[in-house]
């Protein structure tokens, strides 16, 4: 059976056919996994950051799904992949980031913070599909004193009234990768962040853990847009003084020298 990796929508349909044939061919999932594993990808690289597009982005998505999905078997993991795509993925004409924009964003954050020189290896995949509930997504895996991360940038699901652009979504996701790097965990933030919020007079007592993770990512975004508005400003209601504090905080935890 040929597998179509051109985008996540066709992959969803391909996996649907695979499900129908499973009773006839119990090796079908293994054949799919082998087809994914044997492909050689050709990313655009900027230091430790690799950027994937087209079918390479789809294959990178699948590989990360297998790597980060707890499963007792290959079949269960493939089944979970299909269910996720069936439930969340749709074809869309929403706005999408492109390679030149990603490269430009990375140039800006490198100029500000030497970002790519300081962080772990990160793959960035441009996904030609809409993910329900998400404009982008970040994940990482951790080893002994090591980290490897991935960002998936979908077609825009919601720009929140024109506030967000694909570039600011990328900046937000880079903020998540920063906290992965600093803490070595997906859901733990550096203690310095809570002290920073107290200095600003912010009350986080009723904020959920998930809210705090998003707030940290937005703090990185605010730090960048304090220095440049060319990507837009999703938070015009936040003063430049607060944005300057965000910039100083990020600069301190990720020094330029």
Name each region found by the language model.
Residues 1:
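Surface-exposed receptor/substrate recognition regions of extracellular proteins
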């Amino acid at each position: 059976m040929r597998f179509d990796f051109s985008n996540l929508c066709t992959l969803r349909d391909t996996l649907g056919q695979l499900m129908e044939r499973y009773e006839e061919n119990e090796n079908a999932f293994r054949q799919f996994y082998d087809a994914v594993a044997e492909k050689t990808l050709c990313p655009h690289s900027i230091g430790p950051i690799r950027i994937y597009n087209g079918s390479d982005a789809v294959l990178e998505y699948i590989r990360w799904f297998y790597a980060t999905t707890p499963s007792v078997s290959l079949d269960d993991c493939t089944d979970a992949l299909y269910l996720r795509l069936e439930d969340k993925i749709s074809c869309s004409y929403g706005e999408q980031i492109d390679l030149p924009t990603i490269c430009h964003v990375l140039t800006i954050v490198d100029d500000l913070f030497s970002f790519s020189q300081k962080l772990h290896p990160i793959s960035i995949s441009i996904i030609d599909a809409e993910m329900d509930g998400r404009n982008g997504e970040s994940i990482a895996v951790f080893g002994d004193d090591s980290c490897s991360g991935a960002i998936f940038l979908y077609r825009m699901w919601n720009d929140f009234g024109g506030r967000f652009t694909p570039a600011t979504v990328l900046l937000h996701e880079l903020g998540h990768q920063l906290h992965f790097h600093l803490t070595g965990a997906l859901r733990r933030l550096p203690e310095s962040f809570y002290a920073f919020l107290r200095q600003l007079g912010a009350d986080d007592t009723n904020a959920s853990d998930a809210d705090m993770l998003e707030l940290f990512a937005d703090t990185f975004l605010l730090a960048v847009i304090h220095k440049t508005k060319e990507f837009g400003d999703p938070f015009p209601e936040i003063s430049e003084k607060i944005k300057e504090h965000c910039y100083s905080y990020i600069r301190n935890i990720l020094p330029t020298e």
